[in-house]
């Protein structure tokens, strides 16, 4: 049987030898066309033009583009590249690339390597073949990819990969990068203006991001015996193993030797590509692990995380693993997330979300800290929508990840600081102001010396010098949640600046004006702050009283993206137009429908073509056994064969339910497929098709416990998770 052959194969595997290629610091970014490489290979004027484009967003003219392309081509060929590609991130959530050779014949007998500014700056692509929400049709398919100078090109394998944006012929964004860049630009502008209240030398604020990538590793031979794992990325059925994660013995435990070899190989690949991987460890669930890089500028961090997942898949294959990024591949053990650590840093080297040792710097910290909380309070439904997907629905609110309710955790000490600021008067005496600055604002750094609590049930937590958005799914593209978070904070900082300036014009001193607005924001955003157990029923009831949203399903959450408030936000900041928002709403619904549809088809197939035939085969064995007992014991056989007869009856009952439920699920699917639009289809798949999954699974899992282990064809949880 394939299952037992796969088990033997998995158990006999040895770690793949991974040669060390020198010091890690010397490997770093060898295959990246970064600032150092450009400085060495480009003219001074061309280098200055590219730096200006990266830091100030200025356009590069065709002459300079040709010089850059020539330097890039020569560098890439020296690294073994034979092809180039515009590497982009369409709304599939993954990456896309088309390889074109540098090779070009010039005569019948001679060829050269050619790559010019035209090929570097812009390429044409078929936009209708990617998710576009109706923006592009087959008969008007043209789309464009355009070079993003702020994310350095890299050589992977034999291909020069040039990070690009992807837009329609009519200008609408068809990717995750374009609106992200616009959001980061809006936040830079808004944050810089506010930061200049405290330091006139600030001319730029950069958003930083660090993505903690969780994943499962399963032996390839074992994974190949599970059609559900190979097609959907998760197990649609399977009884839980007797041992799961209840002993807490996997988290931070010794890394298995095969996995460690994979990690070492992966890290070397990542370092060559400039991905600054730092931390590796076992996660909570069996066969679950985490990799975390050092934070980077947000646009680059998003690119690197997308690249990282591609690299992880390829390296896993070399080590005879299948890597699972699905948010909930196994029932009964933790799923996987991707905590996004978000912060703001000035070009003067100050982290705006890190407390300082001086009251004035801490006032700056409080300004950005409180404005971020206020932004989350105002737009929490959009943050929830930014992480909504059919796969992440299985994880959110499952007592292992943040609930679907967005709340902000800041810890007891900072709560006390905000409470003290909230009750302070507008008309403080000089002595009271000094007291407030020295003993409340001034002592913030000291608070962090003893702050060790971490509320894992909060979706948005302050962790000392950054905010950690924990609701992001492990397979998600980080561009979407980062774009939304950056946009709402940009909008809030803009509103803050207007309010403070109005008070200053009215005669208030700058510091008093800032305190006044911050006090108002503390009061208005109090409902989003929560320090307790986010998993509890009491919090769900309390959140409802506070007026916080609780969108438990993706179709429900995605509706927030096209609300009047959302459209006004994204249009006013210039991040997304109403047309783009409507398109993304349709794309999100379509993806949800297709994901649930595929899972439904696979589940029905496995139930009827694997589980039921195996159960019938075992039932026939039992029937033959009962017949034999009857021959031996005569009329008293029923007493002797009571257990077998009961088992035969139970198997028939489970098979009957499976058949009827699969049939009903297929009919529900047919009904959903004939509904007029994706909004109706998504609601139908969510409320009418998906509920069958658990019922069918329950009866299949019961049969797994009854059927002879020697006959069961599907690899079991204990074998998948403990090999």
What are these regions (language model features)?
Residues 1-21, 138-154:
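N-terminal hydrophobic targeting/anchoring segments and the immediately downstream early-domain regions
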Residues 64, 88, 116-117, 293-295, ...:
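Active-site proximal loops enriched in glycine and acidic residues that flank catalytic Cys/His/Asp
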Residues 93-109, 128, 133, 226, ...:
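Short linear, low-complexity motifs centered on an aromatic residue
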Residues 141-325, 334-337, 344-586:
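Glycine-rich, acidic/polar active-site loops that bind/position phosphate-bearing ligands
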Residues 520-723:
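C-terminal amphipathic alpha-helical interaction region
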Residues 11-116, 121-137:
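Histidine/acidic residue-rich metal-binding segments in metalloenzymes
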Residues 64-68, 88-90, 118-119, 166, ...:
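Active-site-proximal loop/turn and secondary-structure-junction residues that shape catalytic pockets
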Residues 81, 85-89, 304-318, 344, ...:
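Hydrophobic/aromatic-rich, well-ordered segments within soluble, folded domains that form packed cores
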């Amino acid at each position: 049987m394939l299952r037992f052959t796969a088990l033997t194969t998995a158990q006999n595997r040895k770690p793949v030898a991974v040669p060390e290629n020198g010091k890690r610091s010397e490997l770093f970014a060898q295959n990246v066309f970064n600032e150092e490489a450009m400085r060495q290979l480009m003219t001074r004027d061309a280098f200055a033009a590219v730096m200006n484009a990266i830091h100030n967003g200025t356009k590069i003219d065709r002459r300079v583009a040709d010089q850059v392309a020539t330097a890039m081509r020569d560098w890439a060929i020296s690294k073994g590249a034979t092809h180039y590609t515009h590497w982009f991130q369409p709304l599939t959530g993954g990456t896309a690339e088309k390889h074109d050779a540098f090779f070009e014949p010039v005569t019948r007998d001679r060829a050269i390597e050619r790559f010019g500014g035209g090929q570097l700056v812009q390429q044409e692509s078929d936009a209708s073949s990617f998710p576009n929400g109706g923006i592009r049709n087959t008969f008007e398919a043209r789309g464009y990819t355009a070079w993003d100078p702020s994310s350095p090109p890299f050589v992977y394998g034999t291909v020069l990969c040039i990070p690009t944006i992807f837009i329609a012929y009519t200008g609408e964004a068809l990717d995750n990068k374009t609106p992200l860049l616009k959001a980061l630009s809006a936040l830079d502008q808004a944050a810089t203006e506010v930061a200049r209240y405290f330091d006139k030398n600030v001319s730029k604020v950069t958003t930083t991001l660090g993505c903690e990538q969780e994943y499962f590793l399963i032996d390839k031979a074992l994974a190949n015996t599970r059609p559900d794992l190979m097609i959907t990325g998760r197990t649609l059925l399977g009884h839980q193993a007797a041992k799961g994660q209840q002993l807490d013995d996997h988290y931070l435990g010794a890394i298995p030797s095969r996995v460690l070899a994979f990690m070492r190989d992966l890290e070397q690949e990542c370092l060559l590509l400039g991905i600054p991987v730092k931390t590796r460890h076992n996660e909570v669930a069996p066969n679950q692990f985490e990799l975390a890089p050092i934070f980077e500028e947000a646009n680059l961090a998003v690119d690197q995380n997308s690249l990282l997942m591609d690299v992880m898949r390829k390296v896993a294959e070399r080590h005879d693993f299948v890597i699972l990024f699905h948010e909930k591949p196994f029932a009964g053990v933790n799923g996987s997330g991707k905590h996004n650590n978000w912060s703001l840093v000035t070009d003067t080297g100050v982290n705006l979300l890190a407390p300082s040792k001086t009251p004035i710097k801490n006032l700056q910290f409080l300004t950005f800290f409180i404005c971020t909380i206020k932004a989350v309070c105002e737009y929490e439904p959009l943050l929830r929508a930014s992480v909504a997907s059919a796969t992440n629905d299985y994880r959110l609110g499952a007592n292992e990840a943040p609930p679907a309710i967005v709340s902000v955790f800041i810890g007891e000490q900072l709560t006390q600081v905000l409470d003290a600021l909230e009750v302070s008067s507008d008309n403080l005496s000089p002595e009271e102001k000094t007291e407030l600055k020295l003993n409340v604002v001034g002592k913030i750094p000291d608070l962090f010396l003893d702050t060790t609590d971490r509320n894992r049930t909060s979706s948005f937590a302050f962790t000392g010098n950054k905010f950690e958005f924990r609701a992001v799914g492990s397979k998600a593209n980080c561009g979407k949640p980062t774009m939304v978070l950056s946009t709402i904070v940009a909008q809030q900082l803009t509103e803050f600046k207007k309010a403070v300036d109005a008070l200053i014009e009215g005669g208030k001193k700058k510091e008093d004006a800032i305190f006044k607005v911050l006090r108002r924001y503390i009061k208005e955003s109090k409902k989003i702050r929560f320090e307790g157990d986010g998993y509890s029923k009491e919090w769900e009831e309390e959140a409802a009283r506070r007026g916080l949203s609780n969108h438990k399903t993706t179709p429900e959450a995605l509706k927030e993206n096209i609300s009047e408030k959302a459209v006004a936000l994204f249009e006013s900041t210039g991040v997304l137009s109403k047309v783009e928002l409507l398109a993304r709403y349709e794309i999100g619904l379509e993806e949800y429908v297709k994901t649930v549809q595929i899972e439904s088809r696979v589940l029905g197939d496995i139930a009827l073509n694997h589980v039921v035939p195996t159960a019938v085969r075992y039932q026939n064995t039992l029937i033959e056994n009962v017949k034999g007992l009857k021959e031996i014991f005569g009329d008293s056989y029923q007493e002797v064969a009571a257990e077998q007869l009961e088992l035969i009856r139970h198997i028939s009952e489970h098979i009957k339910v499976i058949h009827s439920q699969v049939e009903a699920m297929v009919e529900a699917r047919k009904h959903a497929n004939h509904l007029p639009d994706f909004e109706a289809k998504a609601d139908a798949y969510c409320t009418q098709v998906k509920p069958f999954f658990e019922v069918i699974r329950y009866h299949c899992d019961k049969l797994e416990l009854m059927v002879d282990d020697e006959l069961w064809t599907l690899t079991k949880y204990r074998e998948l998770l403990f090999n």
